[in-house]
From Swiss-Prot:
GO CC annotations on file: extracellular space
Domain of life of the organism encoding this protein: Eukaryota
Family membership: Belongs to the cecropin family.
Subcellular location: Secreted
Modified sites of kind Leucine amide: L57
Transmembrane segments: none
Signal peptide from the UniProt entry: 1-23
Organism: Culex pipiens pipiens (Northern house mosquito)
Protein's name in the database: Cecropin-A
Keywords: Amidation, Antibiotic, Antimicrobial, Immunity, Innate immunity, Secreted, Signal
Alphabetical list of Pfam families matching this protein: Cecropin (PF00272)
Predominant cellular place of this UniProt entry's protein: secreted
GO biological process: antibacterial humoral response; defense response to Gram-negative bacterium; defense response to Gram-positive bacterium; innate immune response
Amino acid sequence: MNFNKLFVIVLLAALAFFGQAEAGGLKKFGKKLEGVGKRVFKASEKALPVVTGFKALGK
C-alpha cells in the first residue's frame, strides 16, 4: 500500500518537472537567431551573383 502511494507521488512529481514548460527566454532567443539567419541568407543571395560574375571576369 505504501509503495502505491509513493509511486503516485513520484509520478506526479515527475510530471510536474518534466511536463510542458514555457519557452520564455529561449523562444525570444530563437526568434532573434532566426532573424539573423534570414538576414545572412538574403545578403548572401544578393552577393553570390556578384562574386560569381567577378570570378568569371578573372578567368
